[in-house]
A protein has these predicted regions:
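Catalytic pocket-lining loop regions of alpha/beta-barrel enzymes
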Residues: 1-117
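Mid-to-C-terminal alpha-helical segments outside catalytic/metal-binding sites
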Residues: 111-116, 122-162
Length: 162
């Protein structure tokens, strides 16, 4: 059974599992349980997409902005651990992808088999612009049909056996 987890930066600060900058505890879990699918989610998780991710508490709880620098810890973990998946549904995932269109599209294509919409909350008042962004990228031919289908519904159907 896969697990989708929300991440926090320190105990008592916010809900979720706690990890340090660079996600060393997540890596330890990925190594220890190679047959378990971990689905990452939330700001501290997506913050690590860029090589210039700052280690301070405030930065790790932000959505991130500006160009993504190659060599981010999250990208390294995704490349090294096939049991690491990622949830794009919240604005943390959306901002990580949309903040740098070229990088975001490359990331979506490279990891299309392990990206999906999943969430840890139900809130009809929040706006999540990534869905429309993905639709537009697909319609404009910037995102392949295969990646679009997998990310939008096929991966979730497969992983959760729907």
């Amino acid at each position: 059974m896969p697990i989708l987890f929300h991440m926090s930066t320190q105990e008592g600060y916010e809900y979720g599992i706690v990890d340090e900058p660079g996600l060393p505890m997540l890596e330890e879990a990925l190594e220890k349980y190679p047959g378990l699918k971990f689905i990452g989610h939330s700001q501290p998780f997506w913050h690590e997409i860029s090589q210039d991710a700052k280690p301070d508490l405030k930065s790790r709880m932000e959505w991130g902005r500006g160009p993504v620098r190659e060599g981010g810890r999250l990208v390294c973990l995704m490349r090294n651990y096939k049991n690491l998946y990622a949830d794009l549904s919240a604005n943390s995932g959306g901002c990580a992808i949309m903040r740098d269109e070229k990088f975001g599209l490359q990331f979506l294509e490279e990891f299309q088999d392990r990206l999906m919409f999943g969430t840890d909350m139900v809130n009809t008042d929040m706006v999540f612009p990534l869905g429309e962004w993905l639709d537009r990228q697909y319609q404009e031919g910037k995102l392949s049909a295969q990646a679009y289908r997998k990310i939008c519904f096929e991966n979730a159907k497969k992983i959760f056996q729907l």
